[in-house]
């Protein structure tokens, strides 16, 4: 059987942190594993949206940079050499007569005995700055992602938004930029209390309650933004080198909603085995829901082994759901 028609034990749809850990764990269970990821690189939102952000709620790490966590997860799964298919968005999943699954992407067709969906919040894109002239500066010095902090070294930066990402980005930029302003339409930020406390103690100029109403530039780059006080008459113009927008992201399940899975809002319903309503399809991470679900990376790390162990039992009912401890596997 060649690679095109090989039937894998477990195919993981979604190469974010939970998918990477699921691949490692499936490797420990001696499963043949394939990861299918729609983005050009592994890591999901951590690599694409927040590679420079620090994460503080991962067990064993007082803090860890998002991309560092992804790199460690990739390194962890490497001994088991899972097959990785990048830039392939899954369009459909069909159960075959023999009980295996046919997984069709825009590029290829894959086959698997079981599937674990770890697609996070599904397809996502940023909410954009809805102002005339803004679009022409996107990709120049209006940004929706921060992939490399060093590019802002010595520059005057304004960050727009009031959530965790906006506040965290502002705090990180303070260390490298010549000046940082944060613009939010409300007086109170929605970010974690600890981050807001750090913001208030920092040198960052806090512009609240203001919204941007105009962007000005020379056609090649943005040079100024005009701010308007919410429910007030005060206006202010900032001279800046970079404008970072964090209004959040719009996500959708995309084709997943057509796969016959039982859904609740934009999440896939699972039972205590992380099993969907379709036998052989499991979920882990933010994509799934159940009573009492908490959406954290740490939660997904716990769900992934449950999904893998039950998937292995589905493939071969003689296989133990409760595995040996990892300390005995690597001796």
Swiss-Prot record:
Entries under Pfam families matching the protein: Pyr_redox_2 (PF07992)
Cofactor: FAD
Gene3D superfamilies cross-referenced by the UniProt entry: FAD/NAD(P)-binding domain (3.50.50.60)
Chain sites annotated for binding FAD: 37, 45, 50, 90, 124, 286, 327
Details of cofactor binding: Binds 1 FAD per subunit.
Keywords: FAD, Flavoprotein, NADP, Oxidoreductase
Catalytic function, reaction form: 2 reduced [2Fe-2S]-[ferredoxin] + NADP(+) + H(+) = 2 oxidized [2Fe-2S]-[ferredoxin] + NADPH
Xref: InterPro entries: FAD/NAD-bd_sf (IPR036188), FAD/NAD-binding_dom (IPR023753), Fd--NADP_Rdtase_type_2 (IPR022890), Ferredoxin-NADP_redctase_2 (IPR050097)
Enzyme Commission number, as recorded: 1.18.1.2
Signal peptide: none
Gene Ontology MF term list: ferredoxin-NADP+ reductase activity; flavin adenine dinucleotide binding; NADP binding
Subunit structure and binding partners: Homodimer.
HAMAP family assigned: FENR2 (MF_01685)
Record family assignment: Belongs to the ferredoxin--NADP reductase type 2 family.
PANTHER family reported for this sequence: THIOREDOXIN REDUCTASE 1-RELATED-RELATED
Protein name (record): Ferredoxin--NADP reductase 2
Source organism per UniProt: Listeria innocua serovar 6a (strain ATCC BAA-680 / CLIP 11262)
Lineage: Bacteria, Bacillati, Bacillota, Bacilli, Bacillales
